[in-house]
Amino acid sequence: MFDGKSILITGGTGSFGHKYTETLLARYKPKRLIIYSRDELKQFEMQQKFHAPCMRYFIGDVRDKERMHRAMQGVDFVIHAAAMKQVPAAEYNPTECIRTNIDGAENVINAAIDNNVEKVIALSTDKAANPVNLYGATKLASDKLFVAANNIVGAGASRFSVVRYGNVVGSRGSVEIG
């Protein structure tokens, strides 16, 4: 499925992106695997770990529509894992949470449509099912944007889907242990 394809992972330096990169490289031979993240230190650390010639690192933020558009040129698949997911930070910085989780989702969708990306898979959370905080509410809105994008493209090239999952042990999520 991913052999010979170009794949972009937004939030690629996060817990999911890091593990997914490991899995992709072990199972497939992608033409390009682009890690899109605003964290240059984590990108540097990933460069030290993953030496596959297909790896590319793109400093960028999903809130920047022009940068997002450029990063998706020639991409076949997008895994959208970028999010502001720390619940207390989202509550204290609501505008930044909305800009990242909702506006960022819209930027991913528009860039994918404009670049004829074959498939976009957006990661979501169980907190979007019955939101009780801003993080859950923004992820619910994001989910709806991705699903509705299929109506916008109609029979067009791009397809969009959302995968919701719960808290993952060992991730840098918002669950406090102890």
Residue ranges and their predicted role:
Residues L41, R63, K85:
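Adenine-nucleotide cofactor-binding loop residues
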Residues K5-R27:
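N-terminal Rossmann NAD(P)H-binding glycine-rich loop of SDR-like oxidoreductase domains
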Residues F77-H80, M84-V153, S158-G166:
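Conserved Rossmann-fold NAD(P)-dependent oxidoreductase catalytic core, especially the SDR/UDP-sugar
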Residues M46-M55:
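Short, conserved SAM-binding/catalytic segment
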Residues L25-K42:
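Conserved glycine-rich Rossmann-like NAD(P)H-binding loop of the short-chain dehydrogenase/reductase
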Residues R56-F77:
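Conserved Rossmann-fold cofactor-binding substructure of NAD(P)-dependent oxidoreductases
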Residues S37, F58-I59, R99:
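Conserved residues in the N-terminal Rossmann fold of short-chain dehydrogenase/reductase
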